[in-house]
UniProtKB/Swiss-Prot annotation:
It comes from the Bacteria. Participates actively in the response to hyperosmotic and heat shock by preventing the aggregation of stress-denatured proteins, in association with DnaK and GrpE. It is the nucleotide exchange factor for DnaK and may function as a thermosensor. Unfolded proteins bind initially to DnaJ; upon interaction with the DnaJ-bound protein, DnaK hydrolyzes its bound ATP, resulting in the formation of a stable complex. GrpE releases ADP from DnaK; ATP binding to DnaK triggers the release of the substrate protein, thus completing the reaction cycle. It comes from Haemophilus influenzae (strain ATCC 51907 / DSM 11121 / KW20 / Rd). The gene is grpE. Signal peptide: none annotated. HAMAP family: GrpE (MF_01151). Pfam families: GrpE. Homodimer. It is found in: Cytoplasm. This is Protein GrpE. Belongs to the GrpE family.
Length: 198
């Protein structure tokens, strides 16, 4: 080979070597950054997963908190209602028992007697005052009488003993009250025993 040919080949070989070196460096450089870029991408992916998990956990905890608050509020409300009912109806048994006394005083006033006699009249007046005071006292605690002649029959408040035609009364009107009924704060503690017009 001539010197000139060698000179031509040398720069070309040098250029080729430079290209190979550059490619090698780029390959080495890209190999160095590929794992780094992969690691960065993986870290970002894991960060997103963690953010999602944290949001889900926060939402779950928020839901649990709201449910717990609602349960506490419901429990408080139920307890208040139970206490209120206990106050309202604590007197129910006592009221039922005292109704017999009221009935007996009313029967005593309904007995035929010589009311012209002063001693009998004084006795009746005393029984009447006692009855009024007793009815007034139980009334202050929510006990009210039900079952009045002429009022419409209500199966929630009245117990019909019989139905029979009665003059001056419409069908399903109370014609006779055999025993008064009573309610305690609107709740029936004893239905009125009545006869109903047919």
């Amino acid at each position: 080979m001539s010197e000139q040919e060698q000179k031509v080949e040398i720069p070309e070989v040098e250029k080729q070597e430079e290209v190979v070196v550059e490619e090698t460096q780029q390959a080495e450089h890209s190999q160095e950054f590929d794992p780094l870029e992969e690691a960065i991408a993986r870290v970002q992916e894991l960060e997103e997963q963690l953010k999602t998990q944290i949001e889900e956990a926060a939402n779950k905890e928020q839901d649990i908190l709201l449910r717990s608050r609602a349960e506490i509020e419901n429990l408080r409300r139920r307890t208040e209602q139970d206490v209120e009912k206990a106050h309202k109806f604590a007197l129910e048994k006592f009221s039922k028992d005292i109704l017999n006394t009221i009935d007996n005083l009313e029967r005593a006033l309904a007995t035929p007697a010589n009311k012209e006699d002063e001693s009998v009249k004084a006795l009746f007046d005393g029984v009447e005052l006692t009855l009024k005071e007793l009815v007034s006292t139980v009334g202050r605690f929510g006990v009210e009488a039900v079952g009045v002649v002429g009022e419409a029959f209500n199966p929630d408040l009245h117990q019909a003993i019989s139905m029979q035609p009665a003059e001056g009364f419409e069908t399903n009107q109370i014609s006779v009250v055999l025993q008064k009924g009573y309610t305690l704060n609107g709740r029936v503690i004893r239905p009125a025993m009545v006869m109903v017009a047919a």
